[in-house]
Amino acid sequence: MRVLRLLAFALCGHLLGGQVFAQANFLAGIPRNEVLIAENPQGRITNPTWFNIWVVNHGGDSNGLQQLGMDTLWYIDADAGIDGVWDNSLASDKPTYNADFTEMTVKLRDGIFWSDGVEFTADDVVYTVETQMKNPSMLWGPAFLASLDTVTAPDKKTVVFKLKRPNSRFHALFTVRWNAAWIMPKHIFEKQQDPTKFDFNPPVTLGPYTLKSFDPNGEWYIWQRRDDWQRTTLARFGEPGPKYVAYIDPGPPDKRVIMQLNHQLDIIHDTSPEGMFTLAKQSPSSHGWFKGFPYAHPDPTLPAVILNNQVDAFKNKDVRWALALLIDIKAVSLASYRGAATISAIGVPPTGLYPKYYFDPLEDWLKSFEIDTGKS
């Protein structure tokens, strides 16, 4: 029955001609072989004309803005730990701290330019920090205010941060695991009376792409590779492959699968296990993170059974512990994610280096753990 429903849905989608995302609607004039089409995991953006990524409750940041247009000092592989992959992006090297970790110095790359031709300098970094400290409602303002005393630029490629107290992790604010403090274009924002009310439309980018067009209803965004991509930090890896990248809201999981089967969606961010099984069987050109089950990269988060602590019974931690021990989490995983969910006995996922840091030391304690209910 499930197969029949899927076939019927696929036939319906074919007959409708992909009415939501008919290629003529958003790829007009763009050859299909020059564009990479990716799912926007945020779906439809409700305020699509807003590109000021530095304010709380901003517009979309998974619509290509963060991925293709923004840049900051460093990137790391969060799964690899502190001795793992470290990539200097806008910075030319790792941060340098003084002996007591109250001062951090950063050297910046030469030859990096904003998409409007203005050179990126230390003034942009200083402006980014000071502006958000002066406007603590901005996204990174509170974090900067908590740690930072002053930030200065001795020259156009050096930034010095003086901290209020020792903090050997201050650089983490500028280090991307998924997100970080993106650098603002000083020459654009300094002209605005209130940086929190500026829509930054169209965005001036440090990344290798610029915004070409977008749907006023927030359904799709198209980005075009910069002619001067060599003047971005990504150039150290070579020329970006696709000339265009489209981020779209492809709809629910079933529709994403159908679109990929029809080569209308190149990258799926999320789908159901059933959807991945369908792609694995029917689409030779579709590949997951792994060749086989569970296909996807284990996310550093945990699907979970969440209890409402406002309910009187659940306010008692012993009740919550009892339920945690009573519920068969393997059955929950099989019923909800076909066994593809990451399972953990504690509030930390067993991915990356976490097994070494948390699970191995706690293994014996977890195996022997019992809860005293007061009843025999």
What do the predicted segments below correspond to?
Residues 7-17:
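Bacterial N-terminal signal peptides
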Residues 64-81, 177-240, 244, 254-255, ...:
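Gly/Pro-rich hinge or "lid" segments in bacterial periplasmic/extracellular proteins
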Residues 37-99, 130, 204:
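N-terminal lobe/hinge region of extracytoplasmic solute-binding protein
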Residues 109, 197, 229-280, 321, ...:
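Ligand-site clamp/hinge motif
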Residues 33-43, 103-106, 128, 160, ...:
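Short, well-ordered beta-strand elements
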Residues 93-138, 152-154, 160-162, 259, ...:
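Aromatic- and charge-enriched surface segment that lines or borders ligand/interaction sites
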Residues 23, 29, 107, 142-191, ...:
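Surface-exposed binding/hinge segments that line
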Residues 41, 174, 236, 269-376:
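Local pocket/hinge segments that shape ligand/substrate recognition
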